[in-house]
Regions:
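Cationic, low-complexity basic patches in intrinsically disordered or flexible, solvent-exposed regions
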Residues: 192
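Unchanged
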Residues: 38, 45-50, 55, 80-169
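Short beta-strand micro-motifs in enzyme catalytic cores
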Residues: 24-28, 73, 124-128
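Acidic, metal-coordinating catalytic segment for phosphate/diphosphate chemistry
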Residues: 9-50, 56
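A glycine-rich, hydrophobic loop/mini-helix early in the fold
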Residues: 47-72, 76
Length: 195
């Protein structure tokens, strides 16, 4: 890769240092725009799909849980790794049902796609919005231990400021959704244009 579209960066190949189902670590042979050449560490994570379920009283379905890596409690949206051959929206719907016992209904609106750490990590993330869903039972995913809660949108900026919205998928999704809504003040249940 070279030229204007690559910002002057050139890549000459990548060798894998570690690889499993969850993560692949590679060393990419690169030349920077300043002419220096070296092996750059790149972490490749699986594609991720996130479900944002918002009810008609402006509450968001979330999982309150403890994450041992940062050592903290907080709120997360539902979602997970996109399986081979699975569409991201289907992943988000499946994960929501497994983790919460609430199944999204109908076609979602794709809210946003992003790379959370583009400096040295690939983790393509897509967020889907549903405004309709059915209670189908208890959560079935035994690895996702936490409490399922409907959290008012009006609490989201405070939770974000306190660092209690865990993970980029949750933070980006919630703040994007809030920023996309027409001005209606706290508690407004008007939807973003086209949603």
């Amino acid at each position: 890769m070279t030229g204007q579209g690559s910002g002057g960066w050139q890549t000459f190949g990548e060798r894998t240092v570690y690889d499993d189902r969850w993560v692949r670590l590679g060393l990419v042979d690169v030349r920077a725009p300043n002419g220096e050449r070296w092996e750059y560490h790149v972490v490749h994570l699986a594609r991720i799909a996130v479900a944002l379920l918002v009810d008609d009283t402006d509450r968001v379905l979330m999982l309150r849980r403890y994450r041992f890596i940062p050592g903290q409690w907080g709120y997360e949206l539902l979602g997970g790794l996109v399986e081979d051959g699975e569409e991201p929206a289907a992943t988000a719907a499946r994960e929501a049902a497994e983790e919460s016992g609430w199944a999204p209904v109908g076609e979602p609106t794709k809210l946003v796609g992003f790379e959370p750490l583009p400096g040295n990590v690939t983790a393509p993330t897509e967020v889907y919005l549903w405004r309709e869903f059915d209670r189908i039972g208890e959560p079935t995913d035994t690895e996702e231990v936490g409490t399922v809660e409907w959290v008012p949108l009006s609490r989201m900026t405070d939770l974000a400021a306190r660092g209690e919205l865990l993970g980029a998928g949750t933070l980006v999704a919630v703040l994007y959704y809030l920023a996309s809504r027409p001005c209606g003040g706290p508690g407004s249940n008007r939807q973003p244009d086209g949603l």
